[in-house]
């Protein structure tokens, strides 16, 4: 009887997680579609200037008002999703692939390479990430590409550590030992038996990392170390309006709300993916 109740509770919990996962996947897909088709859905050109309409408040004609050059803020926020979201996804993709590859090789082969890489990752993790990224971005100069590179340099160790710990656990497992006895090479064992089994934790880490990386990229742009004017990018737009926050608050609030909404959606999606892949819920699938 107790086992039946437990199974029912697990199924109810799993169904709720599935509903949440579907909802947040739809919301994330909607954000991506807006970014992809931004140029086709905006009412005005994001870089079209009209000084006669400078600093207009939100209205039926300009839903989020205009900036100091008369550019429509709604159009710039929507088009800014392309730079803000795609650069974030590119960053997370690069650091997850690189970190996973490095961590897997270190965990499998060990030795001097493992010691050196882990010491490098310790150094990267010892500093506050954004402070380290600020120093690197300042040396590289402004630009979205340089901001992505600066954050990539200090963000890959978390993936390397996850991949390394998972690889160490799998390396001594029975099915890997059987594959070794069957004559598989080291690279075959990594590609066929280890990587497929560590992708789950890596995926969860990457999903949870999207919101953080988006805020850090926006932070670098806000400090003029990322996207440069007149690029429509959320952090850069907030930087351009900060001096007029008290008199023309929509200049900061509009891109700020876009960042807030995107980060919340991706964070909740990451949390839900983590819950869905939790082994405690596997029996109810």
What spans do the regions from the language model cover?
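Transmembrane alpha-helices
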Residues: 82-98, 127, 133, 187-219, ...
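C-terminal transmembrane helix and the adjacent membrane-cytosol boundary/short C-terminal tail
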Residues: 154, 200-210, 249-285
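Generic hydrophobic transmembrane alpha-helix motif, especially the helices
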Residues: 63, 67, 97-99, 107-169, ...
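Hydrophobic alpha-helical transmembrane segments of membrane transport/permease proteins
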Residues: 26, 30-69, 223-231
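Transmembrane alpha-helical segments of polytopic membrane transport and secretion proteins
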Residues: 1-29, 268-285
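Glycine-rich helix-loop "coupling/hinge" segments at transmembrane-helix boundaries
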Residues: 137-139, 151, 166-167, 215-258, ...
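Transmembrane alpha-helix signature in integral membrane proteins
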Residues: 73-108, 262
């Amino acid at each position: 009887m107790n086992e039946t109740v437990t199974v029912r509770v697990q199924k109810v919990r799993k169904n709720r997680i599935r509903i949440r996962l579907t909802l947040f996947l739809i919301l994330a897909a909607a954000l991506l579609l807006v970014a992809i088709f931004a140029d086709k859905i905006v009412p005005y050109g994001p870089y079209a200037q009209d000084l006669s309409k400078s600093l207009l408040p939100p209205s039926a004609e300009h839903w989020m008002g205009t900036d100091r050059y008369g550019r429509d803020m709604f159009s710039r926020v929507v088009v800014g999703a392309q730079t803000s979201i795609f650069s974030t996804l590119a960053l997370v993709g690069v650091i997850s692939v690189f970190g996973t590859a490095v961590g897997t090789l270190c965990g499998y082969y060990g030795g001097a390479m493992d010691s050196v890489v882990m010491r490098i990752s310790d150094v990267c993790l010892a500093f506050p990430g954004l402070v380290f990224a600020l120093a690197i971005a300042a040396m590289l100069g402004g630009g979205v590409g340089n901001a992505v590179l600066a954050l990539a340099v200090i963000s890959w160790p978390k993936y390397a550590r996850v991949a390394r710990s998972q690889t160490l656990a799998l390396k001594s497992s029975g099915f890997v030992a059987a594959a070794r006895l069957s004559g598989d090479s080291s690279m075959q064992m990594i590609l066929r038996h280890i990587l497929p089994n560590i992708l789950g934790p890596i995926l969860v880490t990457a999903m949870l990392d999207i919101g953080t990386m988006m805020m850090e990229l926006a932070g670098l742009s806000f400090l003029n170390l990322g996207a440069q004017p007149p690029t429509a990018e959320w952090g850069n737009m907030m930087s351009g309006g900060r001096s007029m926050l008290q008199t023309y608050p929509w200049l900061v609030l509009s891109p700020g709300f876009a960042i807030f909404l995107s980060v919340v959606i991706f964070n909740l999606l990451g949390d839900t993916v983590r819950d869905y892949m939790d082994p405690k819920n596997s029996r109810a699938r």
